[in-house]
């Protein structure tokens, strides 16, 4: 639809099909540009669309207005696995109602203030903000753990290389 909106959105293989504003809220209807998805089990591409159910998820605000994205949740059939799978999206975690960047934003805001304050500003319940915070904390802890173990492995490899290399 609008190249500028697509560029601002910064989601790969996605275009903004329509934009509507209602009661200090913005609604962007998205459409995927790719006709196929990668199977989560066998990693092969499938273009056999089984069903498409649009969902509404919250994203970062645009110009101080609450923003929602209406995205198609596509389910494909994989001939190799003989099963159905829901397309994974780079901009949101499976089963979540918010974009990753919005959840990361909320996590950062809670670190700077409190769950209560963020709850009031974002007009979300305390429990929602707390759940998002815990989810992001767990992701970051897991990521930090993986980075720490990878770093330790690299250091270990460097020590071995130093011991075995001729001097």
Where do the PLM segments sit?
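RNase H-like nuclease fold core
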Residues: 133-167
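Short, basic interhelical loop/turn and adjoining N-cap
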Residues: 116-132
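Residue-level detection of the helix-turn-helix DNA-binding "recognition helix"
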Residues: 44, 123, 134, 138
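Short, Lys/Arg-enriched anionic-surface-contact patches
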Residues: 82-102
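Short flexible coil/turn linkers enriched for glycine and charged/polar residues
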Residues: 22, 112, 159-162
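Residue-level signal for the short linker/turn that defines the boundary of a DNA-recognition helix
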Residues: 37, 113-114
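Short, amphipathic alpha-helical "recognition" segments used to contact nucleic acids or chromatin
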Residues: 98-113
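Short, conserved DNA-binding cores of transcription-related domains
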Residues: 1-83, 88-89
């Amino acid at each position: 639809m609008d190249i500028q909106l697509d560029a601002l959105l910064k989601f790969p293989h996605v275009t903004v099909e329509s934009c509507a504003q209602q009661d200090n809220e913005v609604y962007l209807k998205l459409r995927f540009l790719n006709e196929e998805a990668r199977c989560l089990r066998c990693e092969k591409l499938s273009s056999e669309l089984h069903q498409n159910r649009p969902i509404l998820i919250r994203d970062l605000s645009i110009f101080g207005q609450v923003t929602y994205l209406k995205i198609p949740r596509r389910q494909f059939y994989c001939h190799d696995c003989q099963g159905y799978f829901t397309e994974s999206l780079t901009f949101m975690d499976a089963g979540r109602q918010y974009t990753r960047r919005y959840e990361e934003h909320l996590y950062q805001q809670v670190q700077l203030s409190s769950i209560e304050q963020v709850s009031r500003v974002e007009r979300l319940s305390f429990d929602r903000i707390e759940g998002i915070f815990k989810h992001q904390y767990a992701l970051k802890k897991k990521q930090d753990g993986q980075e720490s173990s990878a770093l330790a492995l690299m250091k270990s490899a460097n020590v071995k290389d130093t011991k075995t290399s001729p001097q």
